[in-house]
Amino acid sequence: MSADFINQPTFQYKNEYTTQSGNHNEVCVLIGHSIEAVTSAVVLASLGQRVHLYADNELLTQQIQQYGFEHHLQALWQMYEQQQVIISTALPASADTLIQYYETTNFSDSRHINESNEIDDQSTVALYWLFLDSIKPVWAEASWITAFNHSHQQSLPVIISGTEKLGVVSALAQNLQRAWVYYVPFVFLQEGDVYSSMLNPSLWLLGEKTANSRQHLEVLKPLMQHARAAHHADIATIEFARSSIMAMLATRVSFMNEMSRLADSQQVDIKQVSRIMGLDARVGSSYLQAGWGFGGNTLPTELAKLQQSSQTHSLDMPLLQSVMHINEDQKELIFRKFWQYFDGFIDNKTVMIWGGSYKSGSGRTAGSAIHPLLALLWSYNIRTLVYSDKAQDELAMLYQQQSLLQLINNPYQQLSAAQAIFIVSWSPQDQLDIAKLNQHAMPVFDAQNALTRLQIDSLVGDYMGIGRSK
């Protein structure tokens, strides 16, 4: 990827906002190794800011490698690191050490955290941004709060990000003595396109400890202005809104998956039903796709935290429990269709699996249906040929000792050796070659409902989807 290409989407931001952001000697201090922290560092650098990122170096390297499919982010990260616009440094053992370093009059004196970094003597901190998931294993909560409360720079804003039980972030903000404390939930982040989804967020939520104080976050002004929708409120309200949004999305997915089972019994195509439902403005079209369910880290983590919140207050949430139960059961549904198709005679077969990530465009397999599917297939000594271009490295690492797994580089490679095809995650941008499938006339078990009705009708072999069939 050329430097010219890399700079195209950020050029207007730099021209428009670099002069507004004021002091070029300011640095944004980010603390975390998560994909949210890395993306924030790159986006801030794209907006003309200098960034110091503190993280566990080993975990940071792993995170960047695991998100190798985020090509734009990777290229920008490398470029900004080479230019020292982003400087990543090992996270010190205590928050006090880090804060004291920035409160010295000369960053380059003997109290250097990392002596290899060449930092302008006149640098000042624009903000601190804490990513809770990353700091919790290293810094005890009481110690980092005390360190920030003992800081001599109480006018500096502190941003907190992370998914916690309801009220946790609000309590942290109250324990911090400074007025300018904010909460930014990453409800806008779209895996597979994390950079663009943060640069132009679909929804920007900002929790404020002190009402109507967002003017103190001048650095983030471009993101707020370019968001398709934005809202600010007290931190507790934003926490609750974040959790409610994610729970609603998960509920829609599980509802459609429950309806897909009824659609199977009625010989109705649930995909067509989803399109019709989307025409109703009261319903909308988002998250109405039936399939194997949802995975990743965001929705499952959010539901788990919400469940913990309800238990803390002794509240029963049967709807939430049903959503989680349906989702886990749905991941095994496509295997049951496979078992029924062959009347249980599935031992020692060979099958092809297309896709392994939890969503098309991602290279992450956390919560993906491929894991229970593989476990069930292997329990019958079934050989599995898996094509998953973006998730191949992660699958190879997870299952390196599994002799029944073979990772292949072409979806049509070894089709003649398989007795069935499973589709777990297939990108809409990748055209399916129905003619090649028809050369073998094997059954297709589509857990993603990836095929169009025209493609299904063109198949010589049988087709079983989720709430749809041939």
At which residue positions do the language-model features occur?
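Rossmann-like NAD(P)(H) cofactor-binding subdomain of soluble oxidoreductases
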Residues: 106-109, 124, 130-192, 451-456
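NAD(P)+-binding Rossmann beta1-loop-alpha1 motif at the extreme N-terminus of oxidoreductases
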Residues: 3-71, 112, 351-386, 465
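Internal alpha-helical scaffold of NAD(P)-dependent oxidoreductase catalytic cores
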Residues: 171-182, 193-285, 312-313
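Rossmann-like NAD(P)-binding element
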Residues: 81-155, 413-431
